Amino acid sequence: MSVTNLKESSRKQYSEAEWQIRIDLAAAYRLVALYGWDDLIFTHISARLPGPDNHFLINPYGMMFDEITASSLVKVDMNGEIVGESDYKVNPAGFTIHSAVHEVRHDSACVIH
């Protein structure tokens, strides 16, 4: 399978809106790494996904910020369950902080700590 086909197959499993948020969030992770604002694997950025399901994207546990891609981000629900398929897990501490904010602040599209 060519790289182009691999990218296309990854992309097709997400809606246009989710894919754009994934791209933007992965870029935010890379930018934070570029400026040295990350703390190894202990800093997190999450982005709320549109829709009634209350899902958000967060970084995979153990992955450095400069390694994160749109397709490696993990979609989770408010119970910490991974939504869809993922080869990765999430950091429980990061999930706890971000889910608490996303649960009560529906106007917050992104959380960084």
Feature roles, as predicted:
Residues 1-2, 47:
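Polar low-complexity intrinsically disordered regions
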Residues 22-112:
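An anion-binding catalytic pocket shared by soluble metabolic enzymes
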Residues 2-16:
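Generic N-terminal amphipathic, Lys/Arg-enriched alpha-helix
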